[in-house]
Amino acid sequence: MEHSREFPIGQLCRVLGVSRSGFYAWRQRPRSARDQESLTLVARIRAVHRESRGIYGSPRVYRALRAAGYAIGKHRVARLMRLEGLRGRAARRFRFIATRRSADLPAAPNRVARHFHAAAPNRLWLADITQVRTREGWLFLAIILDVFSRRIVGWATSARPEQTVALEALHIAVARRRPEAGLVHHSDRGGSYGCANYQELLDQHGIVCSMSRPGNCLDNAPAESFFHSLKTEWLYHFILYSRVQARSCVFEYIEGFYNRTRLHSALGYRSPEQYEKLVVT
């Protein structure tokens, strides 16, 4: 009985209209097989919820349990989580901000046209930049996302909105993945992507440049979706006092959680790393 530690047994028996002997007989009765199973499931549900940093709600907890071999229905998972007071992190409202085009820089055509599909890794990369607010000021985050697995293959941060932060993210992605010529790189028309240094690096590796239409963030929707997840699942739940703290939080989310373990609905509820291992090997 869940309130037996808060109130005297006699008081509980009077409120519930049962005798003391009946209460003790009920408490000493051996648990049923389903009760034992529920205890085991609750322990595993708590573990999955904890491993997700408290992010997963019942749909993703259910998928994680099924992947681990547990024969359980999604409604039972939702009920057990509700009884245990477990819930996913509610997403805050997220506002998309269009990047202004640098009028003096050339723009590549939109070769993607919102067809965010790739048959293999390193066929289509998406690049984007966002701002993270801290008490110290803005932190600028640049990412490279592989559309095939939604994996973040390169990222970098800077205290200032310099072109070098996007260039550093691209350098990291190229060094990690070593893509073959013909890879399509899609971004907005911001100056960070149209500048000479960035375009030279793309040309050096035979990477084909593609750019969104002016002021249309949906032309780069998966990258925007990643920023939404990063902020609503993670960053918005912290008070970020400094850029160093913010960068540490970004590192933990991308390298410790998102790439390795976060279940992605577009990947059949697998993580980017799991999906690449499953499909490529």
What are these regions (language model features)?
Residues 1-281:
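Charged DNA-binding/catalytic regions of mobile-element recombinases
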